[in-house]
Regions:
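Short histidine-centered beta-strand/loop micro-motifs
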Residues: 50-55, 72, 97-98
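Ligand-binding loop in jelly-roll beta-barrel domains
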Residues: 90-109
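Short acidic-glycine-tyrosine-enriched beta hairpin
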Residues: 74-91
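Short beta-strand segments in beta-sandwich/barrel cores
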Residues: 50, 67-71, 85
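Conserved short histidine dyad/triad with adjacent acidic residue
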Residues: 36-55, 89-92
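Short, conserved beta-strand element in jelly-roll/cupin
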Residues: 54-70
């Protein structure tokens, strides 16, 4: 990740609109800040959410609430719970997220 020169700024997430994205099951709600080439998001997965696609984009994901499950294309499964963080590079490991109980995530990509 290349973070270009960017003056100090703060954001109040309460002012960022929410976008609803349907999954294979359930839905995700995104709040998005685009800062040059860096996307910063608060994402909430509903209970019983499952992504409708495999993702090959790199992310840094921190779980703020709940639990998220990640299925990797090679068959591995990883669980991310409150206070945990994961990272994956662009084109590294195709992955697909789901959540049984719902979760709230802070994501940088």
């Amino acid at each position: 990740m290349d973070i270009p020169f960017y003056s100090f700024e703060t954001f109040d997430w309460k002012t960022i609109p929410k976008e609803k994205h349907m999954g294979e099951t359930g839905f995700a709600t995104w709040q998005v800040l685009q800062l040059e080439n860096i996307r910063v998001r608060i994402v909430e997965y509903s209970a019983n959410y499952k992504a409708d696609h495999w993702c090959k984009k790199g992310h840094i994901i921190h779980c703020l609430e709940g639990e998220m499950n990640t299925e990797l294309e090679d068959g591995r499964f990883k669980k991310l719970s409150k206070g945990m963080t994961y990272f994956v590079g662009d084109e590294s490991d195709a992955h697909r997220s789901s959540s049984t109980i719902g979760c709230k995530l802070f994501i940088v990509d």
